[in-house]
Amino acid sequence: MGGTFDPIHNGHLVAASEVADLFDLHEVVFVPTGQPWQKRSRPVTPAEDRYLMTVIATASNPRFSVSRVDIDRGGATYTKDTLRDLRAQNPDADLYFITGADALASILSWQNWEEMFAIARFIGVSRPGYELDGKHISAAMAELPADALHLVEVPALAISSTDCRLRAEQSRPIWYLVPDGVVQYVAKRDLYRNQNPAGEGERP
């Protein structure tokens, strides 16, 4: 599951659990982005903080793990590089790449997006009522095998990282929106203070 996780919230965890159940996945690997190229319009919390919050949030679920492939690679994070690294580490596994439906819409507009679907199946998770828009998406889906792309609605994705950051900046509670350990980490590190969050548009 790829995402900025800035911060990781309960919607991410519910989405991962739901997808693991629906697709009978042995493991869900959370992959925090290193330097997200599409987020230059706002400050992004340091990668190590986002990585540690993800470790804290997923620690209690034996089906969840966290990978540093994007962080340790350095430079801007691109989905194609993430998939190549995960494939190299898991040559015999059936890979499913879980991402936000909005990010999936962006991926399908890139050049050579077909290469990524040769490495993994894609699962776009979204809040109820979200629809993929755009002629390029319809055309892309028509070219893909039936099992290459799935959309899953997750009610908990009404929670957003943008809202969590804004609440933390305003000293409003984020309890029950993010795991308890992440609440404590954000407070200890004084994250999201003195920031001016922009729009979401991120991988969840």
Curated annotation (Swiss-Prot):
GO MF, one annotated term: ATP binding
SUPFAM superfamilies, alphabetized: Nucleotidylyl transferase
Recorded catalytic activity of this chain's protein: nicotinate beta-D-ribonucleotide + ATP + H(+) = deamido-NAD(+) + diphosphate
Record's keyword terms, sorted: ATP-binding, NAD, Nucleotide-binding, Nucleotidyltransferase, Pyridine nucleotide biosynthesis, Transferase
EC nos: 2.7.7.18
InterPro entries: Cyt_trans-like, NadD/NMNAT, Rossmann-like_a/b/a_fold
Pathway involvement of the protein, from the record: Cofactor biosynthesis; NAD(+) biosynthesis; deamido-NAD(+) from nicotinate D-ribonucleotide: step 1/1
Nucleotidyltransferase listed as a keyword: yes
A GO BP annotation: NAD biosynthetic process
Pfam family, one: CTP_transf_like
Domain of life: Bacteria
EC main group: transferase
Xref: PANTHER family: NICOTINATE-NUCLEOTIDE ADENYLYLTRANSFERASE-RELATED, PHOSPHOPANTETHEINE ADENYLYLTRANSFERASE
HAMAP family on file: NaMN_adenylyltr
Family, as annotated: Belongs to the NadD family.
Protein purpose: Catalyzes the reversible adenylation of nicotinate mononucleotide (NaMN) to nicotinic acid adenine dinucleotide (NaAD).
Protein name: Probable nicotinate-nucleotide adenylyltransferase
Biological source species: Mycolicibacterium gilvum (strain PYR-GCK)
Gene transcribed to yield this protein: nadD
